[in-house]
Amino acid sequence: MFLRRLGGWLPRPWGRKKSTKADLPAPEPRWVDSSPENSGSDWDSAPETMGDVGPLKTKDSGTRRPPGAAPESSRDLKVDQLGSKRMDSLKRDKTASTIQEPARLESGGAIPKLDWDPVDSGGVKNLGVSAQGRLGTIGPEALLEKPGRRQKLLRWLRGEPGAPSHYLQDPEEYLQISTNLTLHLLELLATALLALCSRPLRAILDALGLRGPVGLWLHGLLCFLAALHGLHAVLSLLTAHPLHFACLFGLLQALVLAVSLREPVEDEETADWESEGQEREAKEQREGPGRML
C-alpha cells in the first residue's frame, strides 16, 4: 500500500493524462423573486441565491414550466388572440344585421339568408350570405297557399275579393234568387186558394142562373174575396209562429242557392263535353274517306 501511494507522488516522464470531459462552467447564480405576492408565504420574502434554480415562476401562471415550453405558450397566446378577434368580429356582424333587419322590413326589401361558409384558413367558420338570399326574393304570393273550393265559397259569401269568377258572373241575377223564391211561394199559395174556390163558386153561380158577363164578373169578385181571406188566414198563422216558418224558409232558400250556384259549373262541363264530342265526330268524318282510299 505504501509503494502504491509513493508511485502516485513520483513524476512520470510521459505526463498525466488529461481528462477527456471538458470542465463544465459553474452555473451562475440567479436572482429568484420570492416575494410574498408570488410565493404566498413570508418565508420566501428574503432573496436567495441558488446554484441550479431551474425554471422560474411566471407572474401570469403560478405553475412552473420548463424552459422549452416558452415558444409553445407564445403560440397558444397568439391563437387565443386570433380567436377572440374573430369572435368580436362575428358579434359586430350580428349586431349590425339585427340593426339593419327592421329597416329592411320597413322598406319592403328581401332579407338575405344567412348560412355557414366553408372553413377558412384560420379554422373558424364565418357567416355568409347564400346565393339564394342575394338573388331570390320572397314575395307575399309565395307565402299564401292556394285556397280551396270551400274557402272560395266562404269568401264569396262574406263579400271578400278573390271569389271564383263563375260565382260573380251576374251578381244581380244571383241576388234575385231570394226575392224570386218569396214571390213564387206567395204565387203558389194564391193559385192554390184560387183553385180551391173557383170551381165551387162557378157551380153556385150556375145554379142561381147568373151567366154571361154578369156571372163572369161576379165569379172574379168572389174569387178575389176568397183568396184574400185565405191569404189573411195563412199569414196570420205564419206571424203567430215566425221562428218555425223562418227556419223552414231558410232551409229551402239554402237548397235553392246550392242548386243555383252549381248550375254554371255543370253547364260549363256539359258544354266542354259537347264540344269534345263534336271535335271527335269531325275528326272521324275527316279520317273516314281517307281510310276508304
Swiss-Prot record:
Stretches for region Disordered: 1-114, 268-293
Keywords: Phosphoprotein
Any Pfam family hit: DUF4661
Biased composition (Basic and acidic residues): 73-95, 277-293
InterPro entries assigned: DUF4661
Phosphoserine PTM positions: 34-35, 89
Presence of keyword Phosphoprotein: yes
Protein known as: Uncharacterized protein C6orf47 homolog
Organism: Mus musculus (Mouse)
